Amino acid sequence: MAFITADQILAHLVGDYILQSHWMATEKTKRSLAAGIHAVTYTLPFLYLTLNPAALAFICGTHFAIDRFRLARFVVWLKNQQTPSRVGYAWPDSSATGYPKDVPPWLSVWLLIIADNILHLICNGIALSIWR
């Protein structure tokens, strides 16, 4: 069985982009209520893949944490520490995306979005591999 499948990717895209309102998108990193409502609506398409409460709770909970606390930026910063010491940068020297401040904003935002999506897909894959 594949770890991440096309139906999981489709459920992720529908939940994270089609069902997410502008209010959820702009407020989820500032307010737990917005992040919680987004996490619940995000989880709805996964009802087509599983009815297992543990899988759905894991998908919802990890989505809440990743989005509310922008966990992808820490992953980005950590991966960029795997460089020679003269290239690495301290957390205070990073932008809100986790990249160095001299990286063009358009690039750092898109790379953060990609990292965020990969984190979600990995968490969903774990949940559905264990509890599907």
Residue ranges of model-derived segments:
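Hydrophobic alpha-helical transmembrane segments
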Residues: M1-R132
